[in-house]
Curated annotation (Swiss-Prot):
The keyword DNA-binding applies. InterPro entries: Neocarzinostatin-like, Neocarzinostatin_fam. It comes from Actinomycete sp. (strain L585-6 / ATCC 53650). One of its GO terms (molecular function) is DNA binding. Binds non-covalently to an enediyne chromophore which is the cytotoxic and mutagenic component of the antibiotic. The chromophore cleaves duplex DNA site-specifically in a single-stranded manner. The apoprotein cleaves proteins selectively, in particular highly basic histones, with H1 proteins being cleaved the more readily. GO terms for biological process: defense response to bacterium. Disulfide bonds join C37-C47, C88-C95. Gene3D superfamilies: Neocarzinostatin-like. The keyword Disulfide bond applies. This is Apokedarcidin. This protein consists of an immunoglobulin-like seven-stranded antiparallel beta-barrel domain linked to a subdomain composed of two beta-hairpin ribbons.
């Protein structure tokens, strides 16, 4: 099974809200990192590296919490340049929570603000 990510709540979010991120189907990963990213016009993710959460996976599953921001300073992942302020309301692809496993597996789930 491929990696899956769910976020609760995922819509109508307030700036600074805490969401619960659940990951499953991470077949080979034992730990993961969750963070918020905005999707740029070219399809790259510009992520909020200031607020990321490492968590452990057991049987390919795990849960963590992430604080979400309507706007933040985005960095192209995994080690790319700072792209400046990004806003989830105006980002071409909106925003999502991305979970990356320690073996390169990843999944994502869209979020939106109220």
């Amino acid at each position: 099974a491929s990696a899956a990510v769910s976020v609760s709540p995922a819509t109508g979010l307030a700036d600074g809200a805490t969401v619960t991120v659940s990951a499953s189907g991470f077949a080979t990963s034992t730990s993961a990192t969750a963070l918020q990213c905005a999707i740029l016009a070219d399809g790259r993710g510009a992520c909020n590296v200031a607020e990321f959460h490492d968590f452990s996976l057991s049987g390919g599953e795990g849960t963590t919490s992430v604080v979400v921001r309507r706007s933040f300073t985005g960095y192209v992942m995994p080690d790319g340049p700072e792209v400046g302020a990004v806003d989830c309301d105006t980002a071409p692809g909106g925003c999502e929570i991305v979970v990356g496993g320690n073996t390169g597996e990843y999944g994502n789930a869209a979020i939106s603000f109220g």
